[in-house]
Amino acid sequence: MKKLFLLLLFACTLVGLPHTLSAQTETRPYWETSPEFASEDKDLVLNVLDSLALIKLPHRIYGELELLAVEKDLLSLKTSSSGQWSLRLLPLPNGTPLLALIRTVNTPIGDSALQFYTPSWEEVKDSNAVFTAPQASDFIPTSMSATDRARLEQLLYPLYLVYKWAPQGRLEVSVSTPTLLSDATREADRKLIEAIPHKKYQWKGGHFVLLNQ
């Protein structure tokens, strides 16, 4: 009798999980109102969000559309063979969320754009008050010699940045280096490229704060 009761309890819990997980995904209403996607694509993703307890991520939805990650404040999708779309909700002091969207193209070289929006998907024009993108000079270690610094400046032009969301409201920024490494015929250049640091930022008080210089 006890075993039967436990089985029934487990079944009831499993039935309730999709709705619970979906309800906890606070990105849902902003996905529904996103101006970027067709209503058919939105509905397909919403159906998957309603079935999170029954699937494993990453989950292919159809064609090249794939659900990569979903958390309370995060929704990440693969939108094409080389494209990704990742939305994070950032809390503001007034209690409303700031929509932070990373769009990334992975080929022929990784390249990301980070844009900020109001809850009604109006782009925040003065985004520098929220986040200032690093420049090439920010990725050159100060301990390098003048010769190495000058050479790395050449290698970092043009500069391609890749943005990724990290846990606990963090943002990681790295230089897209695979192409640089494949083109680096000199071992000295390879060592310079491999010394390029990642930048880490923490969301705090309505803007991103650099954690590592």
Residue ranges and their predicted role:
Residues M1-T27:
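Bacterial Sec-dependent N-terminal signal peptides
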Residues S22-L92:
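Terminal domain-start segments
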Residues L77-K78, T104-G110, L152, E187-L192:
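Short consensus segments that form the blades of beta-propeller domains
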